[in-house]
Amino acid sequence: MSRDDQLFTLWGKLNDRQKDNFLKWMKAFDVEKTYQKTSGDIFNDDFFDIFGDRLITHHFSSTQALTKTLFEHAFNDSLNESGVISSLAESRTNPGHDITIDSIKVALKTEAAKNISKSYIHVSKWMELGKGEWILELLLERFLEHLENYERIFTLRYFKISEYKFSYQLVEIPKSLLLEAKNAKLEIMSGSKQSPKPGYGYVLDENENKKFSLYFDGGAERKLQIKHLNLEHCIVHGVWDFILPPP
């Protein structure tokens, strides 16, 4: 039975409500959209089409950005469907890589804040810092050890431009850039009322300009954030732009 025959047969089995939902879902693929491959060595043209279709399928039933877990699965499925060998890490609480692509361990991040910057990346939770000693030098060492668990890092950034217009951006954060944190200038925020007191690790270029900051958050989660990471130091692999029709 051909694909068209299968669709016709299935259509006849749906009730009116299911047919209405099916039509809405099909119309999702007819939205105004642009998929741009801008750089990179892993992804082929098929991946950008497949992943873009998965993004629009998600937004057929949700007004929220793709969560990290949904990103991981959509990313992995799109890679495999496009002919790239990929598999998710077996443990979802793995303190390192999230996915393996052609035998390369990769960490995945997402960013979807309402006030997201076009020029600077912010990762609100890079890793948990645990309940050990709160000494910035030791925390920095833990971050550098964490980097040993993966070779590449990709973050999916979501921009809501208007009620019906949104965009996704796939960016690679070079591991070599993050490794520059070994020379970070550490500063404890002594005036903070938080306990333990938070601190910063500033990564500067040769002209003392800030490349990015490590923020050791001493709050309830005790986590490491990456702040003010200039997009100019990263690789934008692709952009997906969508304009949805009004309901």
Swiss-Prot record:
It catalyses: Endonucleolytic cleavage of DNA to give specific double-stranded fragments with terminal 5'-phosphates. InterPro entries: SmaI. Its EC number is 3.1.21.4. Its cofactor is Mg(2+); K(+). It comes from the Bacteria. GO terms for biological process: DNA restriction-modification system. GO terms for molecular function: type II site-specific deoxyribonuclease activity. It is an enzyme of class 3 (hydrolase). Signal peptide: none annotated. Pfam families: SmaI. This is Type II restriction enzyme SmaI. It comes from Serratia marcescens. The lineage of its organism: Bacteria, Pseudomonadati, Pseudomonadota, Gammaproteobacteria, Enterobacterales.
